[in-house]
Amino acid sequence: MALSSNWQALLASESNPTSNGKNKQSNRKIRNVKKVSKTVNVSSTTQYAPRKRKNGSKIMDMVYNMNKEISKHEKDKLEGKVFEFNPNKANTSTTIKEPVKVGISEDTRINSNKSKEIGKYIAMDCEFVGVGPEGKESALARISIVNYFGHVVLDEFVKPREKVVEWRTWVSGIKPEHMKNAITFKEAQKKTADILEGRILVGHALKHDLEALMLSHPKSLLRDTSRHLPFRKLYAKGKTPSLKKLTREVLKISIQEGEHSSVEDARATMLLYKKEKTEFEKIHRNTFN
């Protein structure tokens, strides 16, 4: 009986066990090599993988960073790069020196290094107290004049000729103690007249201040911010704008937040004039030429 080819091959393999064993061993080696290489690859990958942080290490990092920032802050403080408020050195006094200045002060005015000469342009402002029945009438109590650059030319408290009924301190800033070194009305009038002579006078509602001083000044030499038409149209619907409103709207500066200062108000009017000087002079030429 003839054997099939498959059967013959099976017999041949059984008759040669050595060869078959070698093949099996060889196959095992190949499989082992594959396993080893796989293991090596896995180990090489896990060797560089980041380890999980423990909670303790996060806290230590935070402590380290905090200490680092503290050290940097101390170093900057020693080098003067850091401002530190020291309550022991701070001036916490509630006493306010007179006169109260808000907004435009000696230190904040523009052109503070310019000439202190009187010059061609001056700005004037006055403060008043109440006299007469119920203190409803006004009497001159302070006169202040500054030059074009804001330097004080004249600043004097003035003794009213009438008995003061209402000091109006809340708005005027004038107090009874200011009268100790005050000059007389006649002295104030004379000093002011000498300064005004031949100069361009800037102010707000100048008619009122000049009448209080019993002085006159040529209209061609007046620059009144309360009567400047562009200001009236833009900020008061054609009426007379307050100095406080003009200063806030035009200069972006707040004044008269408490007791008034005639020095501050005079500086404010000069700044307003300088801001719109071209328009002021254009209207002036059209009016007087």
From Swiss-Prot:
Biased composition annotated in UniProt, kind: Basic residues: 25-34
PANTHER family with a match to the protein in the record: RNA EXONUCLEASE 4, RNA EXONUCLEASE REXO1 / RECO3 FAMILY MEMBER-RELATED
Protein name from the UniProt record: RNA exonuclease 4
Source organism of this protein record: Saccharomyces cerevisiae (strain ATCC 204508 / S288c) (Baker's yeast)
Keyword terms: Exonuclease, Hydrolase, Nuclease, Nucleus, rRNA processing
Pfam families: RNase_T
Family affiliation: Belongs to the REXO4 family.
Highest taxon of source: Eukaryota
InterPro entries the record matches: Exonuclease_RNaseT/DNA_pol3 (IPR013520), REX4_DEDDh_dom (IPR037431), REXO1/3/4-like (IPR047021), RNaseH-like_sf (IPR012337), RNaseH_sf (IPR036397)
Nuclease found in the keyword field: yes
Keyword Hydrolase: yes
CDD domains xrefs: REX4_like
Alphabetized SMART domains for the sequence: EXOIII
Disordered: annotated span: 1-34
Subcellular location: Nucleus
Biased segments, Polar residues type: 1-24
Domain Exonuclease: residue ranges: 121-273
Function: Exoribonuclease involved in ribosome biosynthesis. Involved in the processing of ITS1, the internal transcribed spacer localized between the 18S and 5.8S rRNAs.
Enzyme Commission code: 3.1.-.-
Gene3D superfamilies (alphabetical): Ribonuclease H-like superfamily/Ribonuclease H (3.30.420.10)
SUPFAM superfamilies membership: Ribonuclease H-like
Gene Ontology CC entries for this record: nucleolus; nucleus
One GO BP annotation of this record: rRNA processing
GO molecular function: 3'-5' exonuclease activity; exonuclease activity; nucleic acid binding
Note: Present with 4280 molecules/cell in log phase SD medium.
Enzyme class: hydrolase
